[in-house]
Amino acid sequence: MAEDNTPQCSFCGKEKSEVKQLIAADDANICNECIELCTDLIADSDEHGDDDSDIDTSWVNKKLPTPKELRAKLDEYVIGQDAAKKALAVAVYNHYKRLKVSQILANDSKKAKIGADDAMVELAKSNILLIGPTGSGKTLLAQTLARLLDVPFAMADATTLTEAGYVGEDVENIVQKLLQASDYDVSKAEQGIIYIDEIDKISKKGDNPSITRDVSGEGVQQALLKLIEGTVAAIPPHGGRKHPQQELIQVDTSNILIIVGGAFAGLDKVIQQRTEKTGIGFNADVSSKDDSRRSSELLQQVEPEDLIKFGLIPELIGRLPVLAALTELDEDALVQILTEPKNALVKQYKYLFDMEGADITFTKEALDAIAKKAMARKTGARGLRSIVENALLETMYELPSMKDAKTVLVDEQVINEGKTPEIA
């Protein structure tokens, strides 16, 4: 196996000693054999016109952000969750690098140019499971990654899914949402990201057999298997229903990155039972004042066997090789979320009030009070907007009708006691 510092082609993986020439650039290397392959592909395209137009090469020339660059961009929008950001950045980078290589190798007749078929390494898809409490940033991380990579994004709630043939959404509806997000461009949809939330809510009901079919639990997990590992989904055009004699849109999910997430309430207890048996866990129950910190520490130790015990089927866990646990946000992190990200809530309200010709200011005590309320409600970052919206409702109602209002001051009393903000 080559050492990490051995120069090698970024596309075929061959070392410098295995090729005639290796051309180095800032972000990648390419060997003479890959250059010849690309030259032949272009020549074939010129010679045969549109014969190869169905070969997608959208990622071949696109610059792929490195894991460090992805992480730095995530830092601009998401506060904390360093371990999860790192795991996501690496998984997403490897996924789209795999897609880039597969597009170069799309023309079967050219594979021999860069190595025999039996020497080629097939790169498996690294789908991701995010574990973390409500409002910790799971959805935001997935959305932000899709925006940074400029790929279509679709989100689904696992609790609304049922097996095909039952009332509710089936798994193909998720692919339909992605197709809609890509304006029915199949090629774009096949390179997108799907985020499935509340995956923990479809855990199996138990090991005991039941006379009633579990159509929204284990049944949905089974239905998700093919979507996650790769299948060709037949989607009716423009969101209609399937019917006979209808021409369906074929969407291959093999290159769609699947991210699933859930709060997994109670998983920390499952992990605690396992780790205590081996003498490395926590002896106290997770119920004291710092229970959220202990719970987060336990979730960092999650293993596939814990998820199986929780109720996910082994086949599903096997298709989600990247596990990332998010921690519950504390008050300091919530205050940072209010003020620091590019799209921070305080910045959004400042922009709204600027449009009315007024400058809004939140005191430090007001920000602390907002964070405390969100902590008390156990809604995490998701509950911040609701608290601010309620506090500013009356002001936002009156302000557009006021001609001489220049400043709005939000202090602790506005948040805690419902006092109207001071307008001057």
Curated annotation (Swiss-Prot):
Component of the ClpX-ClpP complex. Forms a hexameric ring that, in the presence of ATP, binds to fourteen ClpP subunits assembled into a disk-like structure with a central cavity, resembling the structure of eukaryotic proteasomes. Pfam families: AAA_2, ClpB_D2-small, zf-C4_ClpX. Belongs to the ClpX chaperone family. GO terms for molecular function: ATP binding; ATP hydrolysis activity; ATP-dependent protein folding chaperone; protein dimerization activity; unfolded protein binding; zinc ion binding. Residues 1-50 form the ClpX-type ZB domain. PANTHER family: ATP-DEPENDENT CLP PROTEASE ATP-BINDING SUBUNIT CLPX-LIKE, MITOCHONDRIAL, ATP-DEPENDENT CLP PROTEASE ATP-BINDING SUBUNIT CLPX-LIKE, MITOCHONDRIAL-RELATED. The gene is clpX. GO terms for biological process: cell division; proteolysis involved in protein catabolic process. Zn(2+) binds at residues 9, 12, 31, 34. ATP binds at residues 133-140. It comes from Psychrobacter cryohalolentis (strain ATCC BAA-1226 / DSM 17306 / VKM B-2378 / K5). The keyword ATP-binding applies. InterPro entries: AAA+_ATPase, ATP-dep_Clp_protease_ClpX, ATPase_AAA_core, Clp_ATPase_C, Clp_protease_ATP-bd_su_ClpX, ClpX_bact, P-loop_NTPase, Znf_CppX_C4. The keyword ATP-binding applies. ATP-dependent specificity component of the Clp protease. It directs the protease to specific substrates. Can perform chaperone functions in the absence of ClpP. Keywords: ATP-binding, Chaperone, Metal-binding, Nucleotide-binding, Zinc. This is ATP-dependent Clp protease ATP-binding subunit ClpX. CDD domains: RecA-like_ClpX.
